[in-house]
Amino acid sequence: MASIPPDDDAAAAAAAGAAENGYGNGKGNGNGPAPRPPPAKRPRSVISAAQIRAEFEHHEAGVARVNNGSFGCCPSSLLDAQARWQRLFIAQPDDFYFHALQPGLRRSRAAVAGLVNAGDVAEVSLVDNATTAAAIVLQHAAWSFAEGRFSRGDAVLMLHYAYGAVKKSIHAYVARAGATVVEVPLPFPVASADAIIAEFRAALDVAKAGGRKVRLAVIDHITSMPSVVIPVKELVAICREEGVDKVFIDAAHSIGQVPVDVRDIGADFYTSNLHKWFFCPPAVAFLHTRKDDPIASQLHHPVVSHEYGNGLPMESGWIGTRDYSAQLVVPESIDFVNRFEGGIEGIRSRNHEKVIEMGKMLAEAWGTFLGTPPELCGSMVMVGLPGCLGVESDDDVMRMRTMLRKDFMVEVPIYYNSRRVEAQEMAKDKNGDAVTGYVRISHQVYNVTEDYEKLRDAVNKLVADGFTSSKLRPSQKQETMA
């Protein structure tokens, strides 16, 4: 019979304990009190620099990879754990489905529940990514409009810097169903958390104008582009004070970048990817709902399977034949982070300190500045590019990003700051040129100072050579031929 493939006896014992507690027994519903995460391995010493390099030796050599934010990273030990699950399925898929899959998923859900201080393992569902979690929440909102629980014109609030796929999902699901979508126009560069809170309050007043009900607020914990840590606990409290029905926190980047306590934050729905900053292989995320919320039982995975109606954790745990291995190795990711001094909090703290240090180094070299104060950064920071590079569009930044990748072997996202908040002047560099382009640099355990020096030198060379973004734009003739 197939069984959970543990790395060691501790993991096996954790799985056995899960079964005894009622969430490791066959294909049961997985409800019960949240247990502690599976015990981590206890190596004799913390992981060494050489061991870290070995864990990520599959990264392409010579590339300055300062973009952990987009796709995350996965160490070799986690890839090995994933492969064990994949082989278990391939060896005997029927036995795997009936006896190993659901206990393994409950083991991962239990690990997440302990990680984020969920009240019950039943509050945690595993999904592919935060975009899927958003679809689950927004689908319910759309049904509420369609079935008359919400009135046409009721509002949904979101940040202007919400992730692009989530913004499109809001329009595809709830705007189409009859919602009025109101955006919070956040300034950038950002001066303080107070500035974000003020803009949020003002936008909420707009959303409530004329007695309109605000049915849902979608708030990022860390915005993607530009990257800013949002004061979510304060914004959730404001939503409660102002009578917003539900609050959904899109925290795609949060686990591993900032502390997460879902009960302390107090939102109705909270999602975060585990493959971005928590070392899981892609793709796996969790969606947390509150067990005392009647809406939780009305949420459904957008892919309808045989588990429809058995609760979101079960629906998400089987959406048809596919590779579930990324969702099954969450306990092993906890083992991995516990090899570092201070565990995930130690990693997070060191990444934050280093990315701020590297961001300041780049800003000084380029005569620019950081896009946010350090307290509004996690393990990512926005750094202004010299204004003389002449970034004037999203197309410009994509072409420049491609050039940095191909010509300099630097992988970094670039942001075009096109918006000007009323009464806010466009920030300028040391030469008085408007700063319209920003790089978003990340720091993860595999990064070294030389990665950022490579980026620094590439941009300095472009400036010294008199490069401007216009040189990468297609000619009028090329555009006509296309």
Curated annotation (Swiss-Prot):
InterPro entries: Aminotrans_V_dom, PyrdxlP-dep_Trfase, PyrdxlP-dep_Trfase_major. Its EC number is 4.4.1.28. Keywords: Lyase, Pyridoxal phosphate. Its cofactor is pyridoxal 5'-phosphate. The keyword Nucleotide-binding does not apply. It catalyses: L-cysteine + H2O = hydrogen sulfide + pyruvate + NH4(+) + H(+). Pfam families: Aminotran_5. GO terms for molecular function: L-cysteine desulfhydrase activity. Gene3D superfamilies: Type I PLP-dependent aspartate aminotransferase-like (Major domain) (3.40.640.10). Residues 1-10 have a biased composition (Acidic residues). Residues 1-45 are annotated as: Disordered. The modification N6-(pyridoxal phosphate)lysine is found at residue 276. SUPFAM superfamilies: PLP-dependent transferases (SSF53383). It comes from the Eukaryota. Residues 11-22 have a biased composition (Low complexity). PANTHER family: HERCYNYLCYSTEINE SULFOXIDE LYASE, L-CYSTEINE DESULFHYDRASE. Belongs to the class-V pyridoxal-phosphate-dependent aminotransferase family. Catalyzes the production of hydrogen sulfide (H2S) from cysteine. This is Putative L-cysteine desulfhydrase 1. It comes from Oryza sativa subsp. japonica (Rice). The lineage of its organism: Eukaryota, Viridiplantae, Streptophyta, Embryophyta, Tracheophyta.
